[in-house]
Structures are given as structure tokens and as C-alpha cells.
Amino acid sequence: MTYTVDTPRSRRRRLRWPRLPLGEGQAAWTTRALMLLAPLLSFTLVEYLNYNNPWTDFTPLQIALNLAWYYLGELFFYFVLRRRASAVKWAMGIAWGLGMANHYLISFRGRTLFPGDFLTLRTAANVAGNYDYRPDSMQWLTIGVFAAVLLALSFLPNEKKRPFPWRLFVPAAGAAAVYLGVFFGTGFVESRGIEPSMWKIGRAHV
């Protein structure tokens, strides 16, 4: 008679998280599609938290300028992590987190987060206890969407870390440099009647 010893390792094998049976090529195209679509969803969630409808409240130029930041952030994480699914998770998570912070700031102060606010963190910490931080229905909706995205990503096959993609990095870095130069170093944005620090805050204009 033989006996099977139930070890922690064997239990982990039985409880392995299910993965989609995708081939290497299928998984690659799936993560590429996610990298293309995720910034659109991130932009929608963030602007929804800012009390805006991004697809009707903004001009096409404003939408393009906003989306550029989301794609740049995602590319940054891709070059650092060298995994497409991980880049999607980190870029979306940080964008969503900033959207949540802005949602509170708009509710409390009527405006979004500005770079100068980081210089007054001590003052902000002193008054932070005076506010109600319970999530509202808008926040719960975005929490559900973000959680659903993370759950969907968890079913993808494990992704190997790729060699650094120099062939993609060089043109991406060049395009980013041009965009940042035009955005901050010229009057192009202001000449179109757009405030670089804040496109529009729906609730602040009510």
C-alpha cells in the first residue's frame, strides 16, 4: 500500500490559479491589444472621477493631448518592467489612484491636484482628518472596473521578462521628447485656449 503525503507544495500545485490556454503568439497579441486599449479606459475612469465625460466634454485636441500622457506612462512602465501586462496594471493603477485623489480634492477644494500641492503636504496632513473619505457611488464604480481589469489580467499566461526593446525605445523616446518640448517649451497648447495644468473640471464650473 502506498501513501501520498500532502505537503504545502502539493497543495499549491492543486490550487494553481487558472490561466487562459493561449499560445505564445495569441498571448502576445492579447497584451498588445491591452496596451492599446487600457489608456483609453484609464482616461475614461480618471475624467469620470473628475466629474467629466471625456468623450463629449473635450475637444478632439484635448482628448489627444490627454491620451498622450496615458500612453507615455504605459510605455515608461513597459520599458522598466519589460512585461506588457505588468505595464498595463501599473499604468492604470497609478492613473486610477490619481483620479481618486483628484475626486476627493474636487469635492473638498473644488480643484484637482497641482504640482505645487506637494510643497504643502504638511498643511494638508494637518487638515486631512476633517474630511469624509468614504467612497461615493462614482468611486465604487471605478473600483469595480479597475478590479475587473486586474482580475481579467490575472487569467493571462505568465509573461516572461523581455530583453530591453531598444528598437522601440529609441523612436518612443524621440516622440516623447518632441511632445514634451511642444507641450512645455512652446505656446502651442495655450494658443489653443487650453490650460496645461487642468483641461476642465466639471464640478468646479457648476
Regions found by a protein language model. Name each.
Residues 204-206:
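Conserved small/polar residues in nucleotide/adenosyl-binding loops
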Residues 2-202:
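Transmembrane and membrane-interface helices of multi-pass
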